[in-house]
Amino acid sequence: MASSSSAASLFATECLLYSTASSSTLVGSMGLTTVAAPSSTSALFTFKGVSDPAFHSVTVIPTSPNPAISGTGGLIFQLESNKAALNIFSWQRDHLLQRIILPSKLSCIACSPNGDLVAGGSFDGRILLWQIATGDLLASFDAHYRSVTVLKWTCDGAGLLTGSEDARILVWSLAGLLAPHDQTSSSITSSEHNPAPYCTLADHNLAITDLDISSGRFPHQAMVLSSSSDASVKLWDLRTRSLLSTFVFEQPIHRVVLDCTERFFFAATAPTSSDNLVYRIDLFRKRDASSRMVETKQATTGSQFDFVTDELRGASSVEAHGFGSAAGPTTERIPSARDVAHRAESNGSSIISIREPISSMCLSTNSTSLLVGSVAGNLFVIDVSNSQVVRTVSLLGNAKVSAISDKNAVTNLMVLPKPRDLLGHWETLSSSGTGSSMSGSGGVGGAGAPVGIPVRPIASSFGHHVLASEEDRLSKPYLTRISGNKTTLAFDEHNVDSFIDPEWDSHLVSSELLGRSTSALLSPSQTQSGAPPSTSAIHAQAALEAERLQRENKLLRSQLHQAKAINDEMWSRLVQDRLSVNQVDSE
């Protein structure tokens, strides 16, 4: 029987990527350690040349796990604080891989899950989107009225969420960001325009501090958790674009993280709060025993008796909480630790006290450990099962206590599998003989020099301007998958959920309507015959319909251009006449 250690070796070690801010006595740092035994003095990896990473300024492109093609190495993007520069690191070396000058200073950054795109938010509310391999600036537009505080991609990379100090959350579909000219007719007469958001979530009153997204597909299966300085956390449904529930706290909330199975979430108070607390809010709670176990019934004779309900016989005694109701969004007040009376009545929340102000927070992959970073550079490891702090570690290395201040905050925490291309890892070594190159594997062949897994291509520079003309924008297409797990999409398959359509919802359309949408493409003779249409006939009718729509679209465009030319000529003549009249009057 294989031992537990050998079984554990089949899975990647769970690692923690952390960053700390700079102060007058200590420089900022960024490193990788294990979640099971975190340490900064004996970390797995420490990066050199890190420049004061701020909050939401570090993002990771994971190493490709495909062994058939050797995969591609992972990348780490880090914004320089107060500079329009982006530092790029690789797991295969500890020093800087590339430094890119940006068009402006950015406040936050986020890479898409597939590693093809990187989005940035500026201090003036602008959103920028680059393609990493080519450096093309695919989108650049004013989205918010104030600084962008956080960017989050959905798990499938089909949606981007932006939070700002203007108290709004904007949700963008990738299709709308890449092709905004297809959304409005104003693009015909203007080369510069903003894409339309999929939806706007505007129920907060103060700045958005953090966002977390569930693991569902965008938009039909995704939920969003948002925190704000207005001391509230809100749960949103992207499919219906609606607010599900609001949780009101006593202090402003700085960080929020949702369990991977959506059972609960954690909310951490802001560093400026009087109490350093982490709240656990359960989204599934046990029902009251008095209402679910015994009920009173009245017999036909008039006497009353008690009997055991189905819940006590083994049926579910847990109910969902916080996902809204038939009457609309729900609101729940979360009592503080000082409110003893209400804390005793609250069975859906618990409080974890931290001895230092909280700056960052994340959950382990399986939600067994909660990792909390403080403003003093310490990491608190909390057991989720009992809400106890099991370990406290300093992430400032061998720094003296006198040199540590409240400015050395842990700014970013991310849990990820141990990278395959990590420097010193056995997969970055190649064998010169027939034996194995794994350390301690007992291979007879000698190990050759380390050979790194190929790093994904990065442009030498990022574009500062979006291509103005529509022809130039379309000459460099960006490929994106629009059809679920299938590589091809047949016309007669009504898998509408696989498309990103902000107005379409298959749950609101009957099968009869779907059948009529297919018959609308058929000729009257085919419809009256009653015979099932063939695939070729459907494709032929669809091609004719598409050709007709293209002709009509071309005609409308030409008419619009003519109308615009007439309008411009009338305007110019009016201005010239007015100027000539003013000139005569002045003489």
UniProtKB/Swiss-Prot annotation:
Q: Does the keyword Oxidoreductase apply?
A: no
Q: Name one GO cellular component term.
A: nuclear pre-replicative complex
Question: Which Pfam families does the UniProt entry name for this protein?
Answer: WD40 (PF00400)
| Family matches, as InterPro entries | G-protein_beta_WD-40_rep (IPR020472), WD40/YVTN_repeat-like_dom_sf (IPR015943), WD40_repeat_CS (IPR019775), WD40_repeat_dom_sf (IPR036322), WD40_rpt (IPR001680), WDR18/Ipi3/RID3 (IPR045227)
Q: A GO biological process this protein is involved in?
A: DNA-templated DNA replication
The entry's keywords: Nucleus, Repeat, Ribosome biogenesis, rRNA processing, WD repeat
- Location in the cell: Nucleus
Q: Which family does it belong to?
A: Belongs to the WD repeat IPI3/WDR18 family.
Role summary: Component of the RIX1 complex required for processing of ITS2 sequences from 35S pre-rRNA.
Protein name per Swiss-Prot or TrEMBL: Pre-rRNA-processing protein IPI3
Please tell me the species this chain comes from.
Mycosarcoma maydis
